[in-house]
């Protein structure tokens, strides 16, 4: 199946009009295993999808890790947030943030130039 694509602004970059939002793959309000998350990404790729959205906030990096592992050596377009930097150290109550099983990082917000470039 070929997903329709559109050009991004005045660039030559083409992006699918439908993408996979990967917040649940980070365990945001969902208890999802790494293996099941990988199956979701594999199924999306087999369906012809090449646009994925992830962020440091999703499982405090868990989604980014899974997406990176699954898309390595593939052709894709990735979107993410900026200004959220992962720092080592687990949060005390991850459920307060809607995280079921995050990896042991905490998010620091930095919307200045250096923080945007780091994220």
Q: What is each model feature region?
A:
Residues 1-80, 84-86:
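N-terminal binding-site loop/beta-alpha segment at the start of enzyme catalytic domains
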Residues 91-119:
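Glycine/proline-rich, positively charged
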